[in-house]
Swiss-Prot record:
Function, in words: One of the primary rRNA binding proteins, it binds directly to 16S rRNA where it nucleates assembly of the body of the 30S subunit. With S5 and S12 plays an important role in translational accuracy.
Subunit structure: Part of the 30S ribosomal subunit. Contacts protein S5. The interaction surface between S4 and S5 is involved in control of translational fidelity.
Protein name: Small ribosomal subunit protein uS4
SMART domains: Ribosomal_S4 (SM01390), S4 (SM00363)
Alphabetized InterPro entries for the sequence: Ribosomal_uS4, Ribosomal_uS4_bac-type, Ribosomal_uS4_N, S4_RNA-bd, S4_RNA-bd_sf
Alphabetized UniProt keyword annotations: Ribonucleoprotein, Ribosomal protein, RNA-binding, rRNA-binding
UniProt record similarity statement: Belongs to the universal ribosomal protein uS4 family.
Taxon lineage: Bacteria, Pseudomonadati, Spirochaetota, Spirochaetia, Spirochaetales
Amino acid sequence: MNRKQIAKGKLVRRFGINIFEQPKYDKILKKKPHPPGMHGKARKAKITEYGKQLIEKQKIKFTYGVSERQLPNTFKEAKKHHGVTGYNLLSILETIIDNIVYRAGFAFSRAHARLIVSHGIVILNGRRVTIPSIILRANDQILIQEIDSLKKLIGSNIEQTSAQRNLPTGIELNADYLNIKVKHAPSRDEIPTLANEQMVVEYYSKRA
């Protein structure tokens, strides 16, 4: 296990949930269900309400790989939309291009998806893009560059991720042509519950 995997392993143990949605971290949680530095059934320190909100915010930050600057900006955008702010926040994060690439199985993880986008492998609506934080809208389409080696690689990724793929109804995948079409944002039921988004709303609302 390399250094990055060890760091991610500590994060899933700290949060007590597999925020990276990869089987290897389920194994880590099963083997070591307690947080790093805590052994056996040691008593947990009491966490304040602020501490709980901070933990939920960190879960979302690390799940989607967003920065400390990007997340509050996304929250501000979510507040502008009609409806429930917590759902709006998750909906925006789910429709960022790197997450769509990950959900469709083009990549093994969101970090892998960010690399794919930043390396210019992805074509969005006919134009090559390199910014993994682009928010997609209905009818946006993603293709892979017309390079045989790249298409073969992404095709292989799709095959290998098929068993664990969590593809919302709003994403249409054509695995034969390596094409993704965004139809609509996912419903709340289609978004894995990896954090309490209402606590994140409370966290940022107090700092507005």
